[in-house]
């Protein structure tokens, strides 16, 4: 892919936005090196990586990547036998910590059944060096300072040094407290000169304290003197400082030597973590842009649904459907300038580059985009009315280069094709260039304001016309792309709206040839029919989306029901048994007391009555239900075939075999639900005489699925707890393993109330405040059982 095309389509601006989502310089560097791939399998892999990253962000909100640092230069120094300083060692330790946390994080996701084939394999490459990490953690802090816990010798030296410094300060403070201090000292402070503790003495009293003069004030009136009484203590202090420095150097050298044995492993861990940071940055970028993972085509098929230009304001940009490569391979967009034709070209081109770089694209679900070997673009500033020869020459030079390199795996974007020269010659050139591009097998989208090219889409089976809608009421373009409808002139309508005399407009219409007038009327009619069809299509698509959501909800609820049913029955039976056992024990005690009374001579209590009472209590105890799959009666096994009616033994439901997955498993249609069922769990049902049935179809719009977070900021206390209760039910039904509840920091009352409520909820496994990247103690993370 040419860098020139990336610049024309502003792919560099996308990369700049993407860097804002990286957590480390390693992620940023990977983004700067990002370029569109042209190999179909490579693009598939990078898209799947991003999709897996997005899945993790949806489930967990974030990943433990904070603290990752570029340590490759540190490892280079270790390779040549050099020692690292404390900060460099800490940064390596931080990377080891992130490696361990990331591996544990990924293992937790994999253990609960989250499918992450690519990122799971990437996680497997991380090596946990727990002992090395711990050695660094007890040796240096985040500022690079060597800690007392690094060695016993260092701890002893520093303890002795602190005591010595205390003795020096105590002695000097005694001078400051002396009753003559105000007379002999310039200021009652202890300071340091030449790394020695000194006091500021007035010039005339320098002989009173003896010792060494280390400095004097600018005026010479104050001398900074180390009194003779602390010289020896200061000397001892200096000696201890030298020992401390020597021990620190020994510790750093020792740790550096131990790290040198793991250079390759640390290098690989850092590289893998950089990949994770890059992938999560792509995922977070896609989430912020409300983007989707597109289907990929290796056959030049593009079908973008509600595609938006990613660099324009999402609240204002007009989304358009763009399709190419099935019924036609060339689109000619006609119509006046400033109508949004160029934005359409750039949207298609930029989304292609993004998709081939492994980025999600701003469009709706089920959008398809092609993977091209080459993307060519001849797009310039063609908005001015006057075109110079130099501009025409520049465009033609570019087009010559494009036609010399294009192949059948190419996408060409021509903006204002043939502009800058005589209109008649320019239109003829444009047609010839489009034919030449098609002959090379390329996919082409071209814009032009030449009316002569309107016929191109009708005269060529591989081509179609398109236009950008214009609202004559507001005298402005709507930026809505209309594929299949050529652009028409709006000059008469605009003139009438602006107040031009109707007589002039009528005369002007009479000067236009009948064929052109009829063509404009036909285009106008096409636009109206197209708008009506699009409205009906959108309504149908919305209904289909609602039906799809309903089906997903039902599938999830039915699956959860069958999974939980037996468990709930057994739990209820066990609880009932516990209650009865307790009652039985109490009854046993009562019976024992009654028997004792009988032995002591109490009358009226029969032995058989006691036995009967105990037997009745024992029979009241329910037995724990052990649910097993009912076994079909032994008979000659039936050879299952597609279309057979069957009973699913574990569910007690009837269904129909759709297709065989393997000898051990079938796809079975159970009502409106399609499920994978093991062959041993199926029982053949003899076909019954068909009965006439009345089929009633009803589509209801399902509610929005529960989000992974609940925002309570600004809510009253009682209302907030009600919302939490309802939200937890929705989140459990949606299958989230954990959710985030945002309550803010404030006075802490809401946070405390929410925390107490969560502690007593039967389905909550654990709660914790969010990490810094998750919102700190303004957010509570809830993990379900």
Swiss-Prot record:
Gene3D superfamilies per the UniProt record, alphabetical: 3.30.1370.110, P-loop containing nucleotide triphosphate hydrolases (3.40.50.300)
Disulphide bridges, residue numbers: none
Enzyme class: hydrolase
Record-level GO BP terms: mismatch repair; negative regulation of DNA recombination; rescue of stalled ribosome
SMART domains, per database record: MUTSac, MUTSd, SMR
Domain Smr: 710-785
Protein residues bound to ATP: 335-342
Sample GO molecular function, one term: ATP hydrolysis activity
UniProt keyword terms in alphabetical order: ATP-binding, DNA-binding, Endonuclease, Hydrolase, Nuclease, Nucleotide-binding, RNA-binding, rRNA-binding
InterPro entries, per the entry: DNA_mismatch_repair_MutS_C, DNA_mismatch_repair_MutS_core, DNA_mismatch_repair_MutS_sf, MSSS, MutS, MutS2, P-loop_NTPase, Smr_dom
UniProt EC number: 3.1.-.-, 3.6.4.-
NCBIfam families per the UniProt record, alphabetical: mutS2
Function comment: Endonuclease that is involved in the suppression of homologous recombination and thus may have a key role in the control of bacterial genetic diversity. Acts as a ribosome collision sensor, splitting the ribosome into its 2 subunits. Detects stalled/collided 70S ribosomes which it binds and splits by an ATP-hydrolysis driven conformational change. Acts upstream of the ribosome quality control system (RQC), a ribosome-associated complex that mediates the extraction of incompletely synthesized nascent chains from stalled ribosomes and their subsequent degradation. Probably generates substrates for RQC.
Assigned protein family: Belongs to the DNA mismatch repair MutS family. MutS2 subfamily.
Assembly behavior: Homodimer. Binds to stalled ribosomes, contacting rRNA.
Name of the molecule in the record: Endonuclease MutS2
Organism: Listeria monocytogenes serotype 4b (strain F2365)
Classification of source organism: Bacteria, Bacillati, Bacillota, Bacilli, Bacillales
């Amino acid at each position: 892919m040419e860098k020139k095309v990336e610049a024309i389509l502003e792919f560099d601006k996308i990369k700049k936005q993407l860097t804002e989502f990286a957590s480390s310089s390693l992620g940023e560097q990977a983004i700067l090196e990002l370029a569109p791939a042209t190999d179909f399998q490579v693009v598939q892999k990078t898209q799947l990586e991003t999709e897996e990253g997005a899945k993790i962000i949806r489930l967990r909100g974030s990943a433990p990547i904070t603290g990752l640092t570029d340590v490759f230069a540190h490892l280079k120094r270790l390779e040549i036998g050099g020692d690292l300083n404390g900060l460099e060692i800490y940064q390596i330790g931080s990377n080891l910590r992130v490696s361990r946390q990331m591996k544990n994080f990924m293992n937790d996701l994999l253990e609960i059944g989250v499918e992450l084939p690519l990122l799971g394999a990437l996680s497997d490459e991380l090596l946990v060096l727990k002992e090395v990490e711990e050695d660094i953690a007890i040796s240096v802090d985040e500022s690079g300072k060597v800690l007392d816990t690094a060695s016993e010798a260092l701890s002893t030296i520093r303890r002795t040094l602190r005591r010595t410094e205390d003795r020096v300060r105590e002695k000097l403070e005694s001078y400051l407290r002396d009753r003559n201090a105000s007379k002999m000292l310039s200021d009652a402070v202890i300071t340091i000169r030449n790394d020695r503790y000194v006091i500021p003495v007035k010039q005339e009293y320098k002989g009173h304290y003896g010792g060494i003069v280390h400095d004097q004030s600018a005026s010479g009136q104050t001398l900074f003197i180390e009194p003779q009484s602390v010289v020896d203590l200061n000397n001892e202090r200096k000696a201890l400082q030298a020992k401390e420095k020597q021990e620190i150097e020994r510790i750093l050298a020792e740790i550096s030597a131990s790290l040198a044995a793991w250079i390759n492993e640390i290098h690989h861990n850092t590289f893998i973590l950089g990949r994770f940071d890059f992938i999560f940055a792509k995922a977070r970028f896609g989430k912020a842009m409300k983007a989707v993972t597109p289907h990929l085509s290796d056959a030049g098929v593009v079908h973008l649904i509600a595609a938006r230009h990613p660099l324009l304001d999402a609240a204002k940009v007009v989304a358009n459907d763009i399709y190419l490569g099935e019924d036609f391979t060339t689109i000619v967009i006609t119509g006046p300038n400033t109508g949004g034709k160029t934005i359409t070209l750039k949207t298609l081109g930029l989304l292609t580059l993004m998709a081939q770089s492994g980025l999600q694209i701003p469009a709706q679900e089920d959008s398809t985009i092609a993977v091209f070997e080459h993307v060519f673009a001849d797009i310039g500033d063609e908005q001015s009315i006057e075109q110079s020869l130099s501009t025409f020459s520049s465009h033609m030079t570019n087009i010559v280069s494009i036609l010399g390199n294009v192949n059948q795996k190419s996408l060409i974007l021509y903006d204002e094709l043939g502009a800058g020269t005589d209109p008649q010659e320019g239109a003829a050139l444009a047609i010839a260039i489009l034919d030449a591009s098609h002959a090379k097998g390329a996919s082409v989208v071209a814009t032009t304001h030449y009316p002569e090219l309107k016929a191109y889409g009708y005269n060529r089976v591989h081509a179609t016309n398109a236009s950008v809608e214009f609202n004559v009421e507001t005298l402005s373009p709507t930026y809505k792309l209309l594929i299949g409808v050529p652009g028409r002139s709006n000059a008469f309508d605009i003139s009438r709206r602006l107040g031009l005399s109707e007589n002039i407009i009528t005369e002007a219409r009479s000067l236009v040839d009948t064929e052109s007038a009829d063509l404009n009327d036909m285009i106008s009619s096409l636009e109206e029919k197209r708008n009506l069809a699009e409205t009906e299509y959108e309504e149908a698509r919305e209904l289909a989306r609602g039906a799809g959501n309903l089906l997903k909800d039902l599938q999830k609820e039915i699956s959860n029901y069958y999974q939980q049913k037996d468990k709930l029955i057994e739990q209820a039976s066990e609880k009932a048994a516990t209650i009865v056992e307790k009652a039985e024990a109490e009854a046993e005690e009562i019976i024992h007391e009654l028997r004792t009374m009988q032995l002591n001579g109490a009358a009226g209590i029969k032995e058989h009555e006691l036995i009967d009472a105990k037997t009745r209590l024992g029979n009241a105890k329910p037995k724990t239900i052990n649910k097993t799959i009912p076994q079909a009666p032994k008979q000659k096994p039936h050879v299952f075939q597609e279309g057979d009616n069957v009973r699913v033994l574990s569910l007690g439901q009837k269904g129909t075999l759709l297709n065989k997955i393997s000898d051990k498993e079938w796809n079975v249609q159970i009502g409106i639900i399609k499920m994978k069922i093991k062959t041993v769990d199926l029982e053949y049902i003899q076909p019954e005489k068909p009965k006439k049935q009345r089929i009633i179809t009803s589509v209801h719009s399902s509610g929005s699925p529960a989000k992974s977070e609940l925002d309570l900021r600004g809510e009253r206390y009682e209302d907030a707890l009600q919302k939490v209760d309802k939200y937890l039910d929705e989140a459990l039904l949606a299958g989230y393993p954990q959710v985030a509840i945002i309550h803010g920091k404030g006075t802490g009352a809401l946070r405390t109330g929410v925390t107490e409520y969560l502690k007593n909820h039967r389905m909550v496994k654990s709660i914790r405040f969010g990490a810094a990247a998750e919102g700190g103690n303004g957010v509570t993370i809830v993990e379900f059982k």
